């Protein structure tokens, strides 16, 4: 006997449609270095539909790779949805990779177009002759940076001009939820970077996981500051989760200095701010004596959070850092260190010790530690080590 529940593809289009329908008045704010640019979800939706038309006009293949070389901005968010919602594949390029690695992944992914921020175009320009199949180069003018003279024969198209020439279009239906939606390359292995391809289904499921209370708990009332780059494991899922819930988004742009981020947290009343430990080391002294009462969560990953750093935040802001763990291959949320009801009864020092751990494996994921080179689990006693294996709805 089968159930009677309906079955519909789990696609990123649904995330976009919900934001457009229910949260059009909510804001996406981008820091430009000289001020703030504000747009609403309604405006974002219209521009994203125009961008879909741009991809058609440029002749990008039905499942073509659309690359970005960009900071966290509203424009980057438009690309996050225009590419997969039209059946194409978003490929976020890590701006901090070595030149030879960038050449490898652009060619390996077969990128047809790269959308690049003006402020970092100079990093990309010398590599253009090495990109074998690149058809188009689109400039997103963030107001700074010289335009190199030598672009290897590419005409530099202007993002805003392209959008202005298009009308908003309807997205095609994505019939197969397992269709590729985006891809990131991880350099955390031996040899060349490895490509991780996320599906519509996996992204949808990971977005739901990010909304769970025992995970990142993203919700409509949040004001989310993703300091973690959008080219790093999908900004830890916060870009999709914010759009899915209608949370306000604060995009930091190129200036990730302690003073700039502290100002955004305080002035925009940020509730969730996510970044790596080095970011929070720089931000902490800039928050001293300021009103941080809006903050409810500081997710942190990428490397182990020092106990001293988490405790410094707890003592100064009343809020310890929330350690999480994951990889590009896990989309990336795999565990979040929330203390359970019994652990919250422990002493302050004991709780601080526990917060140095990565927490419990997230709902939807199975994990085990096995003996190296085998499938034999090690004894679960807190002492044995081995190789970690994960599987689940958003695990590559």
Feature-to-residue mapping (PLM):
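N-lobe entry segment of adenylate-forming
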Residues: 1-58, 62, 86, 133, ...
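Conserved AMP-binding/adenylation subdomain of ANL enzymes
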Residues: 204-223, 231-271, 286
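Structural core segment of the AMP-binding/adenylate-forming
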Residues: 15, 57-58, 85-164
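Flexible, low-complexity linker/hinge segments
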Residues: 1-10, 125, 145-180
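Conserved AMP-binding/adenylate-forming core of the ANL superfamily
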Residues: 28-73, 77-81, 98-103, 155-161
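Adenylate-forming
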Residues: 71, 116-126, 142-143, 228, ...
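Conserved adenylate-forming
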Residues: 55-60, 166-179, 183-225, 237, ...
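Conserved AMP-binding/adenylate-forming
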Residues: 298, 305-324, 328-396
